[in-house]
A protein has these predicted regions:
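Non-catalytic C-terminal accessory region of glycerolipid acyltransferases
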Residues: 2-5, 137-285
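Catalytic core of membrane glycerolipid acyltransferases/transacylases, capturing the structured
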Residues: 32-37, 80-134
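Short, flexible loop segments at the rims of nucleotide/cofactor-binding pockets, characterized by
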Residues: 57-63, 85, 129-134, 167-168
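Hydrophobic beta-strand scaffold residues
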Residues: 64, 106-108, 153, 189
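Conserved N-terminal entry element of GNAT/NAT acetyltransferase domains
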Residues: 274-313
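A conserved beta-strand-loop-helix scaffold within acyl/acetyltransferase catalytic domains
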Residues: 299-338
Length: 338
């Protein structure tokens, strides 16, 4: 763990000699012991990528609540840019966990230190050194390549956590880079609003000493144990909405932020939106029927053993789905062996 801590310190303070007292303070804030308990938890061993993220969410008993119908706003396939506000240190986990219910081809723009601390998410992250500044051409190309392959790219355009003020959390100004990516690749643009907050100690530390608050991320994440994150998945924003801004992407990015904050409060949309495609016929009933099943056992890897009690007096979406899957598998088998 000391090796990871030392590397994190070098990344945050390159070519700098850190005094003993300051390094001791950083080590205390980082929390090697709590970090070890998390990273070596048996429920996370041999897991990577989305599977690891979902296991961490389950381990923390973190509840990411979204309205069921809102998942229709995330396209099932095709290039997609997801934009979100950034109130807490675990927004990335919450966003990946939420989007992964629809898509698996996910990458997220994150601080370059994240995959150093958690190598399990390296396949999901595109690391940026200056999150609030301009990105390198290499990283921009990596994002474009992922979108050209039809993947999902998650971005918090503020680039850093919201500040605490007397009037509440204040989101930083959004970097318009996400608009360049969306328009260049003609992607779906999905806004997601997260309702949550870090501890007041964290915000106070960030106000007076940002470097120390950066080292508190692990401890702060664990403080969200058992909490609920309200995730509001908005309708896709039509890219045609930005034509009137005459290439003033900074102004367009500001409107996107205003739009997100408005729909989070059930206010009016500030931009044109695209109505979601409905789920396939019967899928909503199928999902509802599965959720009503009795859980017999919860496995450590997140899987569940459930029992379904069929009411023979009415049609069963689960039996219908099993029948459809059986027919599909048999037809594929006979085609291969014809």
């Amino acid at each position: 763990m000391d090796a990871i801590f030392d590397r994190v310190v070098r990344e945050f303070f390159p070519n700098t000699t850190i005094p003993f007292w300051k390094k001791w303070l950083f080590r205390t804030a980082f929390g090697n012991k709590v970090f070890s308990r998390l990273i070596y938890n048996e429920r996370l061993v041999n897991k990577n990528g989305v599977e690891w993220v979902n296991a961490v969410v389950e381990l923390l008993e973190l509840k990411c609540e979204s309205e069921h119908h809102q998942f229709n706003n995330i396209p099932e396939h095709g290039a997609t840019v997801v934009i979100s506000n950034h109130p807490t240190v675990i927004d990335g986990l919450s966003l990946i966990h939420t989007v992964s219910r629809v898509r698996s081809d996910i990458k997220i723009i994150a601080n370059h230190v994240l995959p150093i601390i958690f190598p399990q998410v390296s396949e999901l992250t595109i690391g940026i050194e200056n999150m609030a500044g301009k990105m390198s051409h290499k990283k921009f190309r990596e994002m474009n390549d992922h979108l050209r392959k039809g993947g999902v790219l998650i971005i918090c355009p503020a680039g850093k956590l919201a500040n605490w003020s007397l009037s509440g959390l204040q989101e930083h100004k959004w970097n318009p880079g996400f608009l360049q990516l969306a328009m260049r690749n003609n992607t779906a643009l999905v806004p997601i609003h997260i309702t949550g907050a870090n501890s007041k100690i964290y915000y106070l530390t960030a106000t007076f000493w940002r470097q120390l608050s950066n080292m508190m991320v692990i401890r702060e994440a664990l403080r969200h144990h058992g909490k609920t994150m309200k995730i509001n998945i908005g309708q896709q924003i039509a890219l045609s909405s930005f034509k009137e801004y005459n290439k003033d992407l900074s102004a367009a990015a500001n409107v996107c932020l205003t739009h997100l904050q408005s729909i989070a409060k059930n206010g009016p949309a500030m931009l044109d939106t695209i109505a979601p495609q409905e789920l396939e016929p019967g899928k909503e009933e199928l999902i509802s029927a599965i959720e009503e099943c009795e859980i017999l056992r919860q496995f450590e890897d997140g899987r569940k053993l459930v029992i379904y009690r069929c009411n023979t007096n009415r049609t069963s979406p689960i039996i219908d789905e099993l029948g459809a899957l059986t027919r599909t598998l048999l037809s594929r088998y006979w085609c291969r062996n014809w």
